[in-house]
């Protein structure tokens, strides 16, 4: 995909990077300073703003509604988002673990028929903009917004007492931006990224998957471990993942494992190796059923389908081996139902 920087005379650094997913939608777009990757002008777009962590069913509803509204108006679609959680800058608190990496988020937004994603360079200066200033400087002047679709519970800009949707409509009228409110079709499901994080932190991947509208995924690179699984006849791929990515609660899970365009059944353990390593190190390791190849250095994606059991301590290796055989049988059964 093409990536361009968006400049603004109001800031000393580009206000955003735009990831163009559908180049045909921006035939009239202009790129300045050829070769520098900066000064890209989109033209007129329909946009929506949000962090979109997880791109769950509520987000999908907003994005698909934006697609419909944009086509009715003959506009390209743009999702405006952030690389880091705004809370970490605005409130100076630690950001929650992410349901999606930035790359995953961009790809999932693209699956909702969005033409481009603008990732804001959310500086302290940008955080001080009021909603009206944000709409003018970032959305209208910077990104060319002509239509803005707002989620039913979304707000942006430096908080202002009693500011509401009617104010956004008024600001938009002054700036030449049509502002609309997305309907509440998904609201009754009480969808939120926070509720999905909580479910995953409890190990309830099945319920989390329902709210996501797909299976939760974690990707990483296979690194060398202690090879204890190999000694038991269950060799595992130990994954090193993005440290900001949320990992489900400790325990064992039935997973699909994606590797080089292929999919394999797998049983994944997230734990502290209580039996073999005295609980000193958290690990994420997967045994691929009916698979023999060496995966060191390879990239894998785990698709979490269901929880097998809690983390537990075993009296010895034979007890652990018996449990792993039971886990494998249960994994096959669980995945067969998920086909």
Question: What feature does the model see in each segment?
Answer:
Residues 38-101:
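N-terminal catalytic cores of NTP/NDP-binding nucleotidyl/phosphoryl-transfer enzymes
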Residues 1-45:
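Positively charged, low-complexity intrinsically disordered leader regions
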Residues 88-175:
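N-terminal Rossmann-like or analogous alpha/beta NTP/dinucleotide-binding catalytic cores
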Residues 4, 117-119, 178-182:
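General small-molecule cofactor/ligand-binding pocket signal
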Residues 3-4, 225-339:
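Phosphate/ribose-recognition catalytic cores of enzymes acting on nucleotide-derived substrates
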Residues 56, 109, 148, 208, ...:
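Residue-level signal for inorganic ion chemistry
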Residues 170-271:
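Glycine-rich, Lys/Arg-enriched anion-binding loops that position phosphate/diphosphate groups
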